[in-house]
């Protein structure tokens, strides 16, 4: 029976990831499968970051609107606040899309994870768009079973991962 090159555990033939150390059996440089807890942390960050950005947009807009009203030009202050808030939103979107092109999300990047295809190459922009925007909708449709699937799947794949043949690695 073959053994894992990282932990020397016996592994069945034909599988890609070690069930003990979660290392890649074909190419050790790809990394290990990310834990479900770490993936949950990244998902939370992927929601918290835009929420904080939205709060900042509202704060900046309100601040400039208030300053404009105090100076007698309420519309000018509101317009400046709206412009700055919009600029912040665009900056976040550009940052997120650049990370998508590298096969990661803001939360995964901050926690040191990335999304790879079966051969270990980065998932890429198109794959990430389908995975994040279509696959995650599917994963969440039936009581979030597609996300919970990660806990029981040997390769720690959710339905959104299976849809585009991706793995989340550290």
Predicted segments with their positions:
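Membrane-interfacial and juxtamembrane segments of integral membrane proteins
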Residues: 2-170
């Amino acid at each position: 029976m073959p053994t894992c090159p990282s932990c020397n555990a016996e592994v069945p033939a034909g599988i890609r990831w070690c069930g003990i150390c979660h290392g890649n059996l074909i190419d050790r440089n790809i990394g290990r499968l990310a834990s479900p807890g770490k993936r949950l942390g990244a998902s939370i960050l992927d929601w918290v970051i835009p929420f904080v950005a939205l709060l900042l947009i509202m704060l900046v807009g309100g601040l400039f609107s208030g300053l404009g009203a105090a100076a007698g030009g309420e519309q000018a202050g509101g317009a400046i606040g709206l412009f700055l808030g919009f600029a912040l939103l665009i900056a976040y979107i550009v940052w997120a899309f650049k990370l998508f092109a590298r096969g990661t999300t803001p939360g995964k990047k901050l926690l040191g994870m990335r999304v790879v295809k079966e051969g270990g190459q980065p998932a890429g922009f198109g794959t990430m768009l389908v995975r994040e925007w279509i696959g995650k909708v599917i994963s969440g449709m039936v009581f979030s079973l597609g996300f919970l699937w990660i806990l029981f799947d040997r390769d720690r794949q959710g339905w959104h991962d299976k849809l585009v043949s991706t793995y989340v690695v550290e």
